[in-house]
Design a protein with these regions (language model features):
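A general structural signal for well-ordered alpha-helical segments in protein cores
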Residues: 22-26, 58-61, 80, 111-112, ...
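Active-site substrate-recognition segment that forms the wall
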Residues: 1, 39-43, 159-282
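A short, glycine/Asx- and small/polar-enriched loop/turn
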Residues: 56, 87-95, 136-143, 155, ...
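Helical element adjacent to the flavin cofactor pocket in flavoenzyme catalytic cores
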Residues: 97-159, 163
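Short loop/edge segments at beta-strand edges and connector loops
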Residues: 79-80, 128-130, 149, 258-260
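C-terminal lid/capping helical subdomain adjacent to the catalytic/cofactor pocket in oxidative enzymes
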Residues: 77, 278-311
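Dinucleotide-binding Rossmann-like beta1-alpha1 core, especially the glycine-rich loop
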Residues: 1-82, 86, 243-244
Length: 311
């Protein structure tokens, strides 16, 4: 999701501004990436609907809306009837919502496919299925990348970008690695149906629902401090399904087509780390993007490219 308005939280004004800047870059970024890769990343601009499922939720939404207004975000309160005009399958008991018309979404799987294709078409070499153990440091310079199969030596002019996500601190040789921890997210997808169960991204108190062009309705996502445990849990899946059903009861009979887990790379302050290493001259960190990695893709690419060029 590309949703800086919907995901705005107290105490994260700097992160919100980064998100807005990156969101503004997305249309041109997506168009260029699609031209270079030949892959449609499914950029959609339908907006996000944040729904309350009861009166207590509605009061919380009103309170949170004050912060969005303070930040000047494009978001407004609407009543339940107006919400159902946007999404007719919403529960009849929904008392109100916040409408964020400027939020977008993109398919992250297609995005990765497009980035890979563009990278390789421009001469990049991608090593797959090879575990990275760490970075070999010699005389305060990154001299090689340690793989499970051996050391990949680097040219003297090379710059290493550490973009290892939640696994950043698992790499050896990085004494100043940022403090990044994994936060597990369980997700699932059901059949979107025809006509589709929804057209917009819907955020409920305990789940969000994202319609995809490939016919899936993605439902996510838990946030769990469980290390790198990739398993699904009955409670996690139940919470997602109940949270989604409270907002969109029509999912009740939708077939489940997929379940998966991922690990968000979270920092203490929830802000990403995009900087040079303090101790290794030719090493740059790009990690800790948490729940905003896809949103911040264009901005991160530009900032990291600037760091590499000026290294």
């Amino acid at each position: 999701m590309l949703a800086p308005s919907a995901e705005a939280q107290y105490g994260e004004s700097e992160l919100v501004q980064m998100g807005l800047e990156s969101l503004g870059m997305w249309p041109d970024f997506a168009a260029q990436l699609e031209r270079e890769s030949g892959v449609d990343v499914d950029l959609r601009r339908q907006g996000t609907l944040i729904v309350a499922v009861d009166r207590d939720d509605l009061e919380w939404l009103r309170h949170a809306q004050l912060e969005r207004e303070r930040l000047g975000l494009a978001a407004r309160m609407i009543d339940g009837d107006a919400a159902r005009e946007l999404e007719p399958h919403l529960a009849p008991t929904i008392p109100g919502a916040v409408w964020c018309p400027d939020d977008h979404q993109v398919d992250p799987r297609r995005l990765v496919q497009a980035l890979r294709s563009a990278f390789e078409k421009q001469g990049g070499r991608l090593l797959e299925g090879v575990e990275v153990k760490g970075v070999q440091i010699e005389a305060d310079l990154a001299a090689g990348v340690e793989l499970a199969t051996g050391v990949e030596a680097l040219a003297p002019t090379a710059t290493v970008i550490v973009a290892a996500g939640a696994w950043t601190r698992e790499l050896t040789g990085l004494d100043d690695a940022p403090r990044v921890r994994p936060v597990r997210g369980q997700m699932l997808a059901v059949e979107l149906g025809a006509p589709p169960l929804c057209e917009h991204v819907i955020r409920a108190p305990d789940a969000y629902l994202v319609p995809r062009s490939d016919g899936r309705l993605v439902i996510g996502a838990t946030m769990e401090e469980m290390g790198f445990d990739p398993r699904h849990t009955a409670g996690g899946v139940m919470d997602l399904l109940v949270g989604a059903w409270e907002a969109l009861p029509a999912i009740h009979d939708a077939p489940i087509v997929e379940m998966w887990t991922g690990f968000r790379p979270m920092t203490i302050d929830s802000e990403p780390v995009m900087r040079r290493s303090d101790s290794v001259a030719n090493l740059v960190y790009a990690t800790g993007h948490g729940r905003n990695g896809v949103l911040l893709t264009p901005l991160s690419a530009r900032r990291i490219a600037d760091l590499v060029r000026t290294a």
